[in-house]
Amino acid sequence: MANRLKEKYLKEVVPALTEKFNYSSVMAVPKVDKIVLNMGVGDAVSNAKNLEKAAEELALISGQKPLITKAKKSIAGFRLREGVAIGAKVTLRGERMYEFLDKLVSVSLPRVRDFHGVPTKSFDGRGNYTLGVKEQLIFPEINFDDVDKTRGLDIVIVTTANTDEESRELLTGLGMPFAK
């Protein structure tokens, strides 16, 4: 069974984008390439349990085992040594990516307190969109009672679009609630 959001992309978004930007081929229409979820755990240096818990939560949110990220270089001010585990990340592609994006847009973002839409300034100039989430509790898989500490995470949506305008139209078509 194809994902609901993927079907919407193929049936509604592709024709709309082709009409607006006059693409010569369906293959030229921008699409979501991958979604990267990153959770930096700064206090993992002093307490390794925090990193394990963060990785567990990231696995619940994404449905995929996270990769533990390590420090690239030592920074004395942060009491950080090279090679010490300081975070976790997950790269979603294909079906899981569409499922996550659908869940993010339709369930998780509306659960954010005082939510007025995601900022429009978070495009990087190459058609990718970055979104920071302040707490992991907005995701339905996270049980409120099991959370020891609120942690934020970064969500990077990588698209094949060449410009921010194309990328924004793509994400708007997929239901991303941008602030007015």
UniProtKB/Swiss-Prot annotation:
Gene Ontology biological-process annotations: translation
A Pfam short name: Ribosomal_L5
Record GO terms (molecular function): rRNA binding; structural constituent of ribosome; tRNA binding
Keywords: Ribonucleoprotein, Ribosomal protein, RNA-binding, rRNA-binding, tRNA-binding
Domain of life per record: Bacteria
Gene Ontology cellular component annotations, sorted alphabetically: ribonucleoprotein complex; ribosome
UniProt family annotation: Belongs to the universal ribosomal protein uL5 family.
HAMAP family reported for this sequence: Ribosomal_uL5_B (MF_01333_B)
Function summary: This is one of the proteins that bind and probably mediate the attachment of the 5S RNA into the large ribosomal subunit, where it forms part of the central protuberance. In the 70S ribosome it contacts protein S13 of the 30S subunit (bridge B1b), connecting the 2 subunits; this bridge is implicated in subunit movement. Contacts the P site tRNA; the 5S rRNA and some of its associated proteins might help stabilize positioning of ribosome-bound tRNAs.
Subunit comment: Part of the 50S ribosomal subunit; part of the 5S rRNA/L5/L18/L25 subcomplex. Contacts the 5S rRNA and the P site tRNA. Forms a bridge to the 30S subunit in the 70S ribosome.
Protein name: Large ribosomal subunit protein uL5
Gene this protein is translated from: rplE
